[in-house]
């Protein structure tokens, strides 16, 4: 029976290898200011095609023989394998020499993980069978840049262009923001000679074998949002120290061992926050250990949920100790390309963001990768105000001052809500009155039905003062509905339900909503009104 169990584990592994070949797209890059005049497009999204095979080798000699045979059949010569050594294992490092069928490539001591290349699968399998107690092994999974996402997806989104910082409510006098905070960017590398990054407090470590600096646009764009230096492209935390850890080569390819090694290096070099604008479908034991190592040192990790546009938050964003970031457009609508699931924590701007790029270019950058950079920058900004503050307190402050999206409460699309730096900055300032219409929510299960269908209009008190009394007026389909909302506490949200006839031949639904406050003056009246036009299925 135990032999059959081992065989079943191997078969599961083979299935994982097959499924991991499915690719996803995270980011769309459109060149907007370059030396050539073409409207060239780039895709710089990352995939970790991860396959995990974990074994606890407490077995008889017969079972070991079966395992050796099966393992040799699924591991080819040249395979890149990670061996995790249990703390109880006292093996001498000489075991890595011949005749055991593999060559050591690298070793991450803090995680007790060895990266090896298998030369002789049969000898390697026998080594595992003979020395398996306290060992786990997995393939060192690769990263890949898939094709450019379909442009039709982005055409339905409202781009931010150069207005993302104002939209977030970032202060113009933030040049000292980020002082005393170190941010690590694990990516393709950064073009430190870009005009928007002149003066950046910067260091770089490459974990790659070659020193080629081509293909570093993705990391450069991330860095410009976090710590851009010029007035035109001022980042959210321009005085932060940036550590660029190059874990992806010029083709945007890397592996889980190198990323895990990069996380450990960033932690050991004193980073406060690690930006991981990358992801994959399955987990990696080596990266799990690296994430736990970062947590033990009180280092924050921020990662993109992915751009697959379907349910399933990517790894490492879905790890419970990583902040998972989705994307919204300029109308605060969750991007249709963003992956979703219960692990999503929050959302930030991610459509048509103007950022730096390599060779002194500027691009429009779309994807959850760039949304992740906004969250990293916001955290660096807040941490710099109180460097000794417990980081969990800062995270809670960020979460408590997010804007609602279409559906009230935590949801699988935007998590707890959308980043609002203005609210975060002013959270301790009393007396701010700010009511907002935040959106409309349609349950997708209802849209395919006939007859009368409900939808919700959601409003939120985004100030710090109680709203004493306000009314909501909604116009749609020739109807006007009025609601008396009464009082609302700071941060509170409330929804009203309305109905429309789905059998109408006119599939366009135009909605206009307006809030009116009684006896109070709203400091930001423009968000009291929301007009939307939707095409119903």
Question: Where would I find each of the regions flagged by the language model?
Answer:
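Substrate-binding/access-modulating region of protease and related hydrolase catalytic domains
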Residues: 229, 247-321, 331-334, 340, ...
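Intrinsically disordered, low-complexity Pro/Gly/Ser/Thr-rich segments with frequent PxxP/GP/PP motifs
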Residues: 479-505
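Protease zymogen maturation seam
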Residues: 59-67, 71, 103-111, 129-182, ...
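Subtilisin-like serine protease catalytic core
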Residues: 171-183, 190-203, 210-256, 319-321, ...
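Terminal connector regions
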Residues: 504-537
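Inhibitory N-terminal propeptides of secreted protease zymogens
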Residues: 22-149, 271-272
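C-terminal subdomain of the subtilisin-like protease fold in secreted/lumenal serine endopeptidases
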Residues: 31, 56, 61-62, 68-73, ...
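Hydrolase catalytic cores
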Residues: 223-226, 247-248, 273, 336, ...
């Amino acid at each position: 029976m135990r032999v059959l169990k081992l065989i079943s584990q191997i078969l599961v592994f083979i299935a994982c290898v097959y499924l991991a070949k499915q690719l996803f797209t995270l980011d769309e890059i459109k060149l907007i200011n370059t030396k050539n005049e073409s409207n060239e497009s780039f895709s710089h999204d990352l995939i970790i095609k991860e396959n995990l095979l974990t074994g606890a080798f407490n077995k008889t000699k017969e079972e070991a023989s079966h395992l050796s045979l099966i393992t040799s059949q699924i591991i080819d010569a040249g395979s890149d394998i990670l061996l995790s050594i249990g703390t109880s294992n006292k093996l001498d490092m000489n075991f890595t020499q011949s005749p055991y069928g593999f060559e050591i490539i690298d070793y991450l001591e803090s995680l007790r993980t060895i990266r090896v290349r298998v030369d002789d699968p049969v000898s390697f399998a026998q080594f595992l069978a003979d020395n398996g107690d306290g060992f786990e092994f997995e393939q060192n999974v690769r990263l890949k840049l898939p094709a450019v996402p379909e442009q039709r997806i982005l055409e339905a989104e409202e781009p931010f262009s150069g207005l993302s910082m104002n939209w977030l409510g970032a202060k113009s006098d933030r040049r000292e923001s980020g002082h005393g905070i170190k941010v690590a960017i694990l990516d393709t590398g950064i073009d430190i000679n870009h005009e928007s990054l002149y003066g950046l407090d910067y260091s770089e470590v490459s974990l790659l074998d070659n020193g080629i600096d081509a293909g570093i646009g993705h990391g450069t764009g991330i860095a410009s949002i976090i710590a851009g230096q010029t007035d035109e492209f001022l980042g959210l935390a321009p005085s932060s120290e940036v550590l660029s850890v190059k874990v992806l080569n010029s083709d945007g390819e890397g592996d889980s061992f190198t990323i895990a090694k990069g996380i450990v290096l960033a932690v050991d070099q004193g980073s406060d926050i690690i930006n991981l604008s990358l992801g994959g479908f399955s987990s990696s034991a080596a990266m799990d250990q690296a994430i736990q190592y970062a947590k033990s040192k009180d280092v924050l990790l921020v990662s993109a949920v992915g751009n697959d546009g379907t349910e399933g938050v990517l790894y490492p964003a879905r790890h419970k100790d990583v902040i998972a970031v989705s994307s919204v457009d300029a109308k605060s609508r969750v991007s249709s390309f963003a992956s979703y699931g219960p692990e999503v924590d929050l959302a930030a701007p991610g459509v048509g963001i103007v950022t730096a790029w390599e060779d002194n270019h500027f691009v429009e950058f779309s994807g959850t990768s760039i949304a992740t950079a906004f969250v990293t920058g916001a955290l660096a900004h807040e941490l710099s105000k109180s460097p000794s503050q417990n980081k969990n307190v800062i995270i809670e402050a960020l979460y408590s001052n997010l804007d609602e999206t279409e559906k009230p409460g935590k949801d699988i699309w935007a998590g707890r809500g959308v980043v609002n730096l203005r609210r975060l900055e002013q959270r301790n300032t009393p007396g701010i009155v700010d009511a907002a219409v935040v959106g409309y929510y349609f349950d997708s299960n209802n849209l395919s039905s006939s007859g009368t269908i409900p939808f919700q209009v959601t409003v939120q008190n985004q100030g710090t003062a109680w709203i004493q009394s306000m009314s909501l007026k909604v116009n749609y389909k020739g109807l006007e509905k009025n609601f008396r909302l009464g009082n609302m506490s700071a941060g509170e949200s409330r929804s009203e339900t309305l109905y429309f006839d789905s059998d109408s031949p006119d599939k366009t639904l135009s909605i206009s909503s307006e809030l009116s406050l009684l006896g109070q003056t709203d400091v930001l009246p423009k968000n009291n009104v929301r007009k939307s036009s939707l095409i119903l299925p």
